[in-house]
Each structure stands twice: as structure tokens, then as C-alpha cells.
Amino acid sequence: MKRSSTIFLQVVIVLIGLGALALLLWEPHIEGRNAHSTLVQTYFHDPFLAYAYIASIAFFVVLYQTFKVLGYVRQDKVFSQEVVRALRTIKVCAIAIIGFVAGAEIFITLSNSDDRSGGVFMGVLITFGAVVIATAAAMFERILENAVAVKSENDLTV
């Protein structure tokens, strides 16, 4: 992969992270029920918001690990144990995101709100994306583990 392509992808990853962080910090202020609340009321009295912030940690870890993998690609270290570890972390975080979204879906279903369809639909979309990412990361992890093993065997033979 060209150096400019990996740098472009790393910039995209950083922009996605900044956009997600801005949304996490800005969205509670424009939500209807928090329009006239103080900062303390907005951020510390909503358990669902705290849950969303805790769940977002896994998302940001995935972004960081993806950034690291792209750095290894740029350095031509694709077939290394570091990439395998980063892919394993991405897989575990994607599974954690699935668990967090499932917990949020249960919370939405059990709450006494009138309109649950939007939240449930967003949860299904996020779960689908996380399943795809976890599956792809597991597949690439397995392929790279085998490639690293073959490479280490070839390095030992003279």
C-alpha cells in the first residue's frame, strides 16, 4: 500500500474519532429534555448517557488500534505479532460493543417510552456493523497468525 494511502486512512481515522467525540460532547446539550439544564444536570443525572460514554471507550480503542495497524502497514510490518495483537484487541472491543448495544436495547425495551423504534433500529445497525468488524478482525487475525508462523519458520531456515 502506498505511503500516501495509509496516511490518508490514518487522517480519516482521526477525523472519525474527533467527529464521534464532538457528537458525544455536543449532543446532550441539544437534546429536547436537556435544552435548559445545567451542565451537572445534563451529564451526571442521565444513566443512559453515562452508559453511552462507557460504551464509547471500546469504539475509541478500536479506532486507536486501527490507527496502529495502518502505521504498521506503512512501515511494512504487516506480518508481525503486533498486528495480530491489534486485530485481537479490535475483535474483543467489537464484541464488547455488541454487548453494550444489547444492554442498551434491553434498557430501551424495558423503559416506558412511547417511541422505541428509532433506538431499536439504531441498535440493530450498530450491532450489524460490530458483527462485521468482529468477524473480519477474527478472520484477518487467523490469517496473519498463520502467515507470521510461516514467516518465522522461513527466517529460521538457511
Regions found by a protein language model. Give the residues of each.
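Alpha-helical transmembrane segments of multi-pass membrane proteins
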Residues: 18-31, 134
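Membrane-helix boundary elements
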Residues: 37-63
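Alpha-helical transmembrane segments and their helix-start/interface "positive-inside/aromatic belt" motifs
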Residues: 1-17
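Non-cytosolic membrane-interface motifs at loop->transmembrane helix junctions
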Residues: 39-42, 116-125
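Membrane-helix interface/capping segments
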Residues: 61-81
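Alpha-helical transmembrane segments and their immediate juxtamembrane interface regions
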Residues: 121-152
